[in-house]
């Protein structure tokens, strides 16, 4: 008898747990992706190059696999294409959400209409598509929403094209960028929700909803929404957690999700829970495939694959506990976490990479995932969640230890930039694009105070910048502030690190150096030193 197969959509890093779990469960892992060089292709038992949005091509291939390879189910995680899964899966009679429900959970205006119809808490919104996207329509909608509001592509993930609109001056260009990032040239404008944000994963199975992950999301850098990490499980108050779970369950019901994975990005606002979005799949961002398994001991991807293959997810059914949420739509359960897992990202200022230092994996660090950033490649301060430079994941019995270890590992990562690059110079100048006031932020808010200090003159070549700072009491006070930059170093640690890395630095203009450090952190400090050396060598 032919070994059973599952068809997995996507061959990137986020799909690696699915490919490995399928093989561990005894399935042939058949994988499709538009990119034959995707980083997890080598793990597949069989690979075919298919664009994940080509639903009819996926269906035809699935039909072939059903006839020839004993196909049992279709699956994805961490992609935009749960609708492609359901389109083929529904036609072939596999266990999955309906195609209509998957579309509801993919196309944001449809999602909002479902929530509206069922009184599910979510922000007020307007949507425009194609020729409807005019400056007049956009400005009228923005005026009705008031500031700040948010624009998103209707059908994209990873926060690509998503940003806050803080004034009329930012509105029209922001919407045009969002439209470019939409596969259907559709955008949604909505109220901004103020409050802490959370991610929830769940399995919908036989009329029950089982929570399989509830994490704190750490979102920064307005006007964009950059997730610098998440921590599993959340530290939220239990009463608030149950309210959020109940609202999530109402949203799952409103979308019509009945069989498979569901994930939510949700906030707790002054109005209570407000749903950002719900997807018909497991989460990406290292949550379902890494941090939840580390914290709970459950291979969630394997359990979701079992559901997709028409089998019982015994690994969650056996250990789940009932939750008393008062929800009328589902019997709700929870698979709680025993440990804490923290994921944190490291990021870069704009420039061109000269060299990379990747942090080592030392307990309790479980994984270090550098993004495909290469020497000679360009980097930028992220405007979406695809532009970060790498991630670390930890596991500990303590929330504080898991977070501390993740931050320490990130602080050890370093991208040295090529000297004398215009993008880096523009950033270090403290200037901003017209519609991005305040972005990218400075490494330290004290950057604005440096200009007013009387610190003219030169730091002698090879002289410790920390010792030099001792001669300037006001500068020393700024260095001793506890504020940390985006890679979890404070200003004092940054100066110490500079002294360690650049003991033979050239003579440095004192004001320019300290402005560069407070604006660009360690990268900025070393960049300005390297640029001085480069200029001297050219002379």
Question: Where are the language model's segments positioned?
Answer:
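Glycine-rich active-site loop/lid that clamps phosphate-bearing ligands
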Residues: 345-375
């Amino acid at each position: 008898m032919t070994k059973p197969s599952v068809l997995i959509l996507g061959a990137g890093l986020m799909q690696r747990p699915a490919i490995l779990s399928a093989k561990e469960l005894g399935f042939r892992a058949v994988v499709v992706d538009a990119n034959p060089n995707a980083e997890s292709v080598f793990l597949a038992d069989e690979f075919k190059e298919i664009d994940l949005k080509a639903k009819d091509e996926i269906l035809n291939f699935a039909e072939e696999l059903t006839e020839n390879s004993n196909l049992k189910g279709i699956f994805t995680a961490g992609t935009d294409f749960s609708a492609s899964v359901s389109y083929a899966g529904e036609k072939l009679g596999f266990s999955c959400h309906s195609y209509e429900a998957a579309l509801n959970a993919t196309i944001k205006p449809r999602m909002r209409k479902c929530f509206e119809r069922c009184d599910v808490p979510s922000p007020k919104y307007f949507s425009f598509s194609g020729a409807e996207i005019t400056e007049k329509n956009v400005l009228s909608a923005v005026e009705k929403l008031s500031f700040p509001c948010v624009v998103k592509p209707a059908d994209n993930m990873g926060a690509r094209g998503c940003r806050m609109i803080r004034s009329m001056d930012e509105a029209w260009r922001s919407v045009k960028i969002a439209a470019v990032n939409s596969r259907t040239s559709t955008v949604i404008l909505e109220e901004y929700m103020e409050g802490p944000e959370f991610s929830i994963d769940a399995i919908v199975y036989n009329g029950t909803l089982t929570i399989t992950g509830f994490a704190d999301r750490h979102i920064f850098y307005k006007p964009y929404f950059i997730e610098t990490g998440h921590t599993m499980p959340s530290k939220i108050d239990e009463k608030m957690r149950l309210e959020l779970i109940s609202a999530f369950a109402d949203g799952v019901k409103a979308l019509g999700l009945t069989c498979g994975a569901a994930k939510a990005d949700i906030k707790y606002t002054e109005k209570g829970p407000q749903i950002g979005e719900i997807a018909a799949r497991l989460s990406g961002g290292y949550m379902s495939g890494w941090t939840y398994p580390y914290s709970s001991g459950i291979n969630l991807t394997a359990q979701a694959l079992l559901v997709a293959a028409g089998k019982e997810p015994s690994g969650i059914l056996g250990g789940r506990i009932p939750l008393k949420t008062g929800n009328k739509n589902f019997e709700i359960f929870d698979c709680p976490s025993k440990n804490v897992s923290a994921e944190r990202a490291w990021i870069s200022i704009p420039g061109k990479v000269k060299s990379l230092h990747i942090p080592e994996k030392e307990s309790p660090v479980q994984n270090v995932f550098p993004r495909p950033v290469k020497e000679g490649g360009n980097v930028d301060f992220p405007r979406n969640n695809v532009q970060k430079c790498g991630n670390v994941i930890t596991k500990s019995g303590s929330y504080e230890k898991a977070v501390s270890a993740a931050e320490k590992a990130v602080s050890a990562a370093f991208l040295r930039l090529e000297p004398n690059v215009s993008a880096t110079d523009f950033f270090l100048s403290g200037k901003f694009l017209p519609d991005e006031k305040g972005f990218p932020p400075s490494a330290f808010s004290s950057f604005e105070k440096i200009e007013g200090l009387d610190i003219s003159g030169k730091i002698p070549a090879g002289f410790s910048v920390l010792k030099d700072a001792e001669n300037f009491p006001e500068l020393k006070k700024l260095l001793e502030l506890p504020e940390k930059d985006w890679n979890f170093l404070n200003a004092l640690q940054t100066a110490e690190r500079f002294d360690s890395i650049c003991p033979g630095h050239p003579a440095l203009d004192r004001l320019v150096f300290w402005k560069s450090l407070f604006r660009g952190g360690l990268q900025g400090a070393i960049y300005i030193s390297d640029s001085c050396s480069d200029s001297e060598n050219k002379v």
